[in-house]
């Protein structure tokens, strides 16, 4: 796949952006040290060529970047300000043992991760010392995949793996003491005990005033079929 990657230094080179956009190929634009006004103008120029296939990269223009400086929350800021474009992270921090920063970036919404790469950080040259070595890339990908897995879909509800614990850990309404047939139920006759496979405590008020149709022993669950009006 042919993609143009525009470094942060060129975000104000509007003639370059115009030319690149005219090829109608996807563009990845880094935004390090750029103001919102500069980003807006760059986007305007690119869109002006009819090219909307654009991704914006959060970036700190510092080689290397200290761990306190990436400001990863910018990923969320860019996503909120520019909802029509994919957002990624261009990361210049030093590789750590578990490659945490790229994974956190993904957790915050980054869809693209850019890191410098080298065969060895001992090689001479300005960018090698903070670049990823092959083993680092493997760790980074593994950690990112783990983060993607644990993030889930964000839907709140009862997951399949929670059903057993939900049933066993929650409580049901039971008789606080022996309840004789024909008794009108009052609140003091009831208490809550595990497991949660009976009537849920949040329905206790529905039981008050109902008449017991049979004897219910202490600690036995109250069942709807044992009651009448």
What are these language model-derived features?
Residues 1-229:
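Catalytic cores and adjacent flexible loops of soluble metabolic enzymes
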């Amino acid at each position: 796949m042919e993609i143009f990657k525009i470094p942060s230094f060129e975000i104000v080179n509007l003639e370059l952006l115009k030319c690149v956009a005219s090829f109608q190929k996807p563009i990845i634009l880094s935004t390090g040290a750029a103001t919102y006004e500069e980003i807006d103008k760059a986007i305007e120029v690119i869109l002006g060529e009819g090219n909307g296939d654009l991704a914006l990269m959060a970036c700190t223009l510092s080689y290397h970047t200290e761990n306190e400086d990436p400001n990863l929350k910018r990923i969320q800021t860019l996503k909120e300000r520019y909802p029509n474009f994919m957002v990624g992270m261009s990361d210049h921090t030093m590789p750590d043992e578990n490659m945490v920063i790229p994974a956190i970036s993904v957790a915050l919404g980054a869809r693209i991760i850019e890191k410098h790469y080298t065969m060895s950080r001992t090689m001479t040259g300005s960018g090698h010392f903070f670049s990823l070595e092959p083993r680092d890339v493997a760790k980074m990908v593994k950690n990112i995949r783990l983060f993607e897995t644990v993030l889930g879909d964000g839907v709140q509800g009862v997951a399949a793996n929670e059903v057993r614990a939900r049933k066993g850990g929650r409580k049901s309404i039971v008789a606080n003491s022996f309840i004789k047939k024909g008794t009108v139920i009052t609140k003091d006759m009831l208490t809550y005990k595990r497991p949660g496979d009976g009537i849920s405590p949040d329905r206790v008020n529905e039981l008050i005033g109902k008449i017991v149709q049979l004897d219910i022993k202490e600690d036995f669950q109250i069942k709807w079929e044992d009651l009448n009006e």
